[in-house]
């Protein structure tokens, strides 16, 4: 608890710098000061989805039963929905600023993603990453229906991967192209992360110890 606030701030900063150093640097001539926030929004959206999926998985294994209720999943759904909207807002803000500035070294990013078949991929990203989850998660009932909510969490993981593909692939390929490595690379990294996560999870208490606010958090009723 002592380091949670500091860790959150450091996580936001390192996430933004990772976006600049790993993704934006693929095209050395293109730059966007808002790109770090764009990456941050997508990352925190996925944190909410993974948190919900892990909680569902643990409850299926007989753990956390009676502790995590549908009200908690509804709150995670609110955060997931909020970051879906925030991601779209930041994405549109970046596009609007580049369109308004109309500088060749900036517009090249979107020009590459509107030519040679990439325009279709851009439309799929807009519809699949924003419009569909916005409609699916806007209602209260959708966040309390665990089958639908779990499906949407998995769906957003896939769309987040597609967002990465949309950022990286046009720099490497003039025309739309997909390799088996685009999928297996993600699966490999996901496997390493899952193994490390489960290793840490097995050695720590699932429920915070001696937390004076724990009872209030577990017994609240959502609206």
Predicted regions located by residue number:
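Long, contiguous internal "core" modules enriched in hydrophobic/ aromatic residues
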Residues: 1-123
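Extramembrane terminal tails and long inter-domain/linker segments of multi-pass membrane proteins
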Residues: 63, 67-71, 189-223
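Membrane-interface segments at transmembrane helix junctions and kinks
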Residues: 108-124, 171-188, 212-223
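Extended C-terminal subregions enriched in glycine
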Residues: 120-146
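Hydrophobic cores of alpha-helical transmembrane segments in multi-pass inner/ER membrane proteins
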Residues: 41-56, 128-133, 185-201
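Hydrophobic, well-ordered secondary-structure elements that form the walls
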Residues: 89, 133, 164, 205
């Amino acid at each position: 608890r002592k380091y949670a606030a500091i860790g959150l701030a450091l996580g936001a900063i390192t996430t933004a710098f990772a976006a600049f150093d790993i993704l934006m640097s693929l095209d050395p001539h293109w730059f966007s000061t808002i790109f770090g926030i764009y990456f941050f929004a997508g990352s925190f959206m996925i944190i909410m989805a993974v948190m919900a999926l892990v909680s569902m998985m643990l409850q299926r294994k007989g753990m956390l039963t009676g502790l995590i209720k549908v009200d908690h999943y509804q709150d995670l759904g609110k955060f997931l929905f909020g970051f879906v909207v925030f991601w779209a807002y930041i994405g549109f803000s970046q596009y609007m600023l580049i369109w308004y500035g109309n500088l060749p070294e900036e517009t090249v990013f979107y020009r590459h993603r509107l030519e040679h078949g990439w325009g279709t991929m851009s439309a799929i990203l807009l519809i699949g990453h924003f419009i569909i989850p916005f409609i699916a998660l806007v209602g209260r009932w959708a966040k309390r229906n665990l089958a639908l909510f779990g499906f949407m969490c998995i769906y957003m993981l896939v769309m987040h991967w597609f967002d990465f593909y949309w950022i990286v692939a046009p720099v490497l390929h003039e025309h739309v192209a997909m390799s088996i490595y685009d999928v297996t690379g993600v699966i490999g990294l996901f496997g390493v992360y899952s193994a490390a996560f489960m290793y840490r999870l097995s050695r720590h208490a699932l429920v915070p110890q001696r937390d004076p606010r724990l009872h209030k958090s577990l017994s609240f009723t959502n609206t």
